[in-house]
Amino acid sequence: MSHRLATALLFTLTNLVITMPLQATPLKDHLWKNRVIITFSASVKEPERLALQKQMEEKACAFTDRNLVHIDLLQGSEDFDEMSQQFAVSSSGFQLLLLGKDGGVKLRSSTASLEDIFSLIDTMPMRRSEMRGDQC
């Protein structure tokens, strides 16, 4: 198996683990285990959504190392409506929320920059203690 094919397969498997539908992963299941990125998109072709997916592919190890999971919600779905009400998110355009391991909203953004998210996470006390055993 070529290195390129193995890398693509690894990312695909990793992405299946980190991008999950809400029904399969209630938020309470992530408390104290994971940080959660929730994205709200009007379309599958939303530029910010596509940019985030590319960044997650390129930075899969750093994403996983920070105990991140991604919940991708599309406008019109029941989960989108429920979560946008719960978190007071507009139903137009792209919105990103970062939830800490404590379940609190740490970031609201209309842009998708994993570097900014990683920088914010790396300032959190819980993350600082985790960084002692980094895998990347």
Residue ranges and their predicted role:
Residues S2-C136:
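Non-catalytic interaction/Regulatory regions outside core domains
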